[in-house]
């Protein structure tokens, strides 16, 4: 049966947790930025219907 040999230090655990949190932060920031550009119609990668 596989068992870890030593306990992970608190500092290493904290570093890994912060990396994990930072990934979520950047994903949320990108989503917010995309939503903002869509709402202001400044996005260059989406086509908007023109009402004439």
From Swiss-Prot:
HAMAP family tied to this protein: Ribosomal_bL32
Keyword Flavoprotein: no
UniProt superkingdom: Eukaryota
Chief site of localization: plastid
GO-annotated cellular components: chloroplast; large ribosomal subunit
Entry keyword set: Chloroplast, Plastid, Ribonucleoprotein, Ribosomal protein
Organism: Morus indica (Mulberry)
Nucleus among keywords: no
One GO molecular-function entry: structural constituent of ribosome
Signal peptide (residue range): none
PANTHER family, per the entry: 50S RIBOSOMAL PROTEIN L32, CHLOROPLASTIC (PTHR36083), LARGE RIBOSOMAL SUBUNIT PROTEIN BL32C (PTHR36083:SF1)
Subcellular location: Plastid, Chloroplast
Protein name, per record: Large ribosomal subunit protein bL32c
GO BP, one annotated term: translation
InterPro entries: Ribosomal_bL32, Ribosomal_bL32_plant/cyanobact, Ribosomal_zn-bd
